[in-house]
């Protein structure tokens, strides 16, 4: 800092980041009200997230009830989903080799990075309306997904 501003005393402050809730993270895990077959669950995810296609690992005939989800590039949470005994892990994108060795652990559903995050603007609008009820909150209609499908 002094090398950049040798002629003056630079002003700076350091503040510790004291998060009140230490359990916050990038993903969520929850339970369905009742179990579903793998195929029925994948079809529902495909419809809910409005995706033309989704990638998944081999179906193993398990029932799906515990669901782990991380939007965007969530592959780094795959081991946590397994550790927490999730039946399925839904994320936006994973690497090819991330699929290997997990056929008996859980179902992996990869729905696309943009597709997994496309509804967050609606969630944020709802939160902002609750905090600022007298302000207008607009949602952009621009599709920023650089990936196109044939």
Predicted regions: what they are:
Residues 2-150:
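Hydrophobic structural segments
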